[in-house]
Every structure is written in C-alpha cells, then in structure tokens.
C-alpha cells in the first residue's frame, strides 16, 4: 500500500518581505509567515491527516513552518529529520542583496536569466537544475521509501527545493516548472502509486497568490 506525501513551502520570511535574495541565509518567519504556516497546518488538520514522520531543511524558516504545521495537527513531538539537501537554492553572490540593487549591478536581463532560467546559476550559486540534483536523490533514498511503505510524510521546505520535486512528480517540462510558483504555507497532498507515480494530488488552499 502506498502512502501520502505532503509538501509545504515555508511561510513568508523577513527577507521575503524586504525583497532580498535569501538562498542559504537564515532569516526567520515574519508574523504573516507564522500565520501562513498555522493556516497550512489547520488545513491539514481539517483534512484529517496524521503524519508518521517529517522532513525539513537546516534553515530556520522551514523548520519553524514544519513545527507550526505539526502543532496544528496535534503532533508537536513527531520525529523530524533536518537535512541540507532540502535547503533553498543557493543564490551565491546574490544572497543578501535587494533584488532591485542586483538589477542595478548586473542588469535586469542578466538577473532575470539567473532567476528564471533552468540551468544558468548566478555567480557562486546554484541553478534550478543544480538544486534538483541534490534534492531528488535525497528524495529517492530517504523520503520516497517511507511513502511507498504506506507512511504519511510531511516535507516542509523552500520554493525551489520543492519545485525540484514537483517538476518530477507532476511531469513538468523545464519551461513549465519555470512558470510555476508555489504559495507560502499552502499544502500539496500527493497520494502515490506503488510504482512511485502520482495517483492523486490535492492543493489545500489558494495558489493564486504565489510569487
């Protein structure tokens, strides 16, 4: 019997609010981000799910989101595995810069290429392809076997690390994944078949406000 995989992007962080490239830097959630995470947890509580294990990154904004979701479903002490493989895309030299300042320094077109191309990394950083090259193997070795054994698994992570998973799960092209934005705090519930393909997907909230 296959299990359930739930993906949740962390709530708004301080640097999201300030329009900064975040990457592997470690800002906390804003008050809105906390409320977004709680809302995602409530949606999962209303859905009626109980998790067997949770996975998150080593960054505080994802860890706090994970804990707030678990609090909401009444599983505050659930085993949670933290791994760097689930970290956000590393923006390298862009990390910590205001996005407008980055455009002024390198030009709007170049920054757009770094942000929205699939395989062109910023200086010292990762492309979306590079991010997927660490996220997907970790999923295959550590997360997927738990789901295929019938467990209900929570993954609270980041926009680009989760897009790397969604790209394969939803069978999206490079062009499609570049246009996909995931809303903060909105759970995506996947039921998987025994062959690891997707049997069904439900989005518990509104993705229209994704950025």
UniProtKB/Swiss-Prot annotation:
SMART domains: PGAM. Its EC number is 5.4.2.11. GO terms for biological process: gluconeogenesis; glycolytic process. Substrate binds at residues 9-16, 22-23, 61, 88-91, 99, 115-116, 159-160. It comes from the Bacteria. Catalyzes the interconversion of 2-phosphoglycerate and 3-phosphoglycerate. Homodimer. This is 2,3-bisphosphoglycerate-dependent phosphoglycerate mutase.
């Amino acid at each position: 019997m296959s299990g359930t995989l739930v993906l949740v992007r962390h709530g708004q962080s301080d640097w999201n609010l300030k329009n900064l490239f975040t990457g592997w830097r470690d800002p906390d959630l804003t008050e809105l981000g906390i409320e977004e995470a709680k809302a995602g947890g409530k949606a999962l509580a209303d859905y009626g799910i109980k998790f067997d294990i949770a996975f998150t990154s080593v960054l505080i904004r994802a860890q706090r989101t994970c804990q707030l979701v678990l609090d909401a479903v009444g599983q505050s002490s659930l085993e949670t595995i933290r791994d760097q493989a689930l970290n956000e895309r590393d923006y390298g030299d862009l990390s910590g810069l205001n996005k407008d300042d980055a455009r002024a320094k390198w030009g709007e077109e170049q920054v757009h290429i770094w942000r929205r191309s699939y395989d062109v990394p910023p200086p010292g950083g990762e492309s979306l392809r590079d991010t997927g090259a660490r996220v997907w193997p970790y999923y295959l070795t550590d997360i997927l076997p738990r789901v295929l054994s019938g467990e209900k698994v929570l993954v609270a992570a980041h926009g680009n690390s989760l897009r790397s998973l969604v790209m394969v799960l939803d069978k999206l092209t490079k062009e499609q994944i570049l246009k996909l934005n995931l809303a903060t705090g909105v759970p995506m519930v996947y039921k998987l078949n025994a062959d690891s393909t997707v049997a069904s997907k439900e989005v518990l909230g509104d993705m229209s406000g994704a950025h």
